[in-house]
Amino acid sequence: MRSNILDYLNSQTFTNFSTSSELPWDASGVPLYLKNMKKMYVDRPQTVQEPLIDTLDDNGIVNETISVTVYVSADAKTLPTDYETMLSTVKAARLQDLTTGWRQRATSVATSFEGDILVTEFTFNFTKLI
């Protein structure tokens, strides 16, 4: 799923933002997106399986959710002119053909501040029955 989102982001044209294929942290755990503002980083997918219907023969129905997080930062005092466009474009990644076959595709966006840096975090949740 990470590669699907990376492919989508790489296919988009942004004026002030770019995409990195690196993971969001360096070897010591320092967030790269704080060092390299206006560069999007896609984290590894996280998978959760929740049983919906358990059966005695272990052939139940399970809800599998894969979550992928994208991080990007910018100077909070002077946001790039295409910041809002970037938000809309990244959120639309869940709707692309790259993510077909999923029963539910959701995106949440959260922002936080690290000093004068605005950190935007997109969390994509893709859910299917298995």
Which residues are covered by each model-predicted region?
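Oligomerization/assembly interface segments of phage tail-like spikes and tubes
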Residues: 58-76, 117-128
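Acidic-leaning, charged glycine-interspersed low-complexity segments
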Residues: 16, 38, 44, 85-130
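Small/polar-rich, solvent-exposed N-terminal microdomains that initiate assembly or binding
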Residues: 1-56, 78-88, 114
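Well-ordered, non-transmembrane segments within structured domains
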Residues: 69, 74, 78, 86, ...
